[in-house]
Amino acid sequence: MPRRARKFKRAVAPDSRYNSLMLSNFINKLMMHGQKATAQRIVYDAIDIMGKQENKEGLAVFEQGLKNATPFIEVKPRRVGGATYQVPIEVRPDRAQTMAMRWIIKAARKRTGKSMAERLASEMLEASREQGAAVKKREETHKMAEANRAFAHYRW
């Protein structure tokens, strides 16, 4: 029996405009220093930009981009004897989504010039077309897992 009480996940309220839990989580990940209103403005502006550029609903482009950047498998280091092996493991759906969000935000922040909303929109558009830094990161992760497939039996 564990000594500590179990830590439960807090329920996140869906966002006000699109009533989407995924978008609410994305806004929370983008938020810095508790400035939620600023993060919301950036995300909503980015969705509007994506909608105009693609002539589709912005939220659909957002969801497609997030889906394309979501990894299925990752590697975790496991120490066996004196060696550390990179063991490929499947990613839980909630963690996979979190990783994709993190990668997209990081890639958007690395881009130069323009406003954050425009950078985020361009990164999301590229992700929806299976291009961009976030999708490249996912491909890298999958390649790493494939290369270390021999150590899959060390899974725990």
From Swiss-Prot:
Q: Which residues form a coiled coil?
A: none
Q: Which keywords does this Swiss-Prot/TrEMBL entry list?
A: Ribonucleoprotein, Ribosomal protein, RNA-binding, rRNA-binding, tRNA-binding
Q: Which InterPro entries match?
A: Ribosomal_uS7, Ribosomal_uS7_bac/org-type, Ribosomal_uS7_dom, Ribosomal_uS7_dom_sf
Record carries keyword rRNA-binding: yes
A Pfam family cross-referenced in the UniProt record is Ribosomal_S7
Q: Name one GO biological process term.
A: translation
**Disulfide bridge map:** none
The UniProt entry's GO CC annotations, sorted and at most eight, read:
small ribosomal subunit
Signal peptide segment: none
Molecular function GO labels:
rRNA binding; structural constituent of ribosome; tRNA binding
Gene3D superfamilies the record matches: Ribosomal protein S7 domain
Entries under PANTHER family matching the protein: RIBOSOMAL PROTEIN S7
Function recorded in the entry:
One of the primary rRNA binding proteins, it binds directly to 16S rRNA where it nucleates assembly of the head domain of the 30S subunit. Is located at the subunit interface close to the decoding center, probably blocks exit of the E-site tRNA.
* Summary of subunit composition and partner proteins: Part of the 30S ribosomal subunit. Contacts proteins S9 and S11.
User: Known NCBIfam families for this protein?
Assistant: rpsG_bact (TIGR01029)
- Family classification: Belongs to the universal ribosomal protein uS7 family.
| Protein's UniProt name | Small ribosomal subunit protein uS7
The encoding gene: rpsG
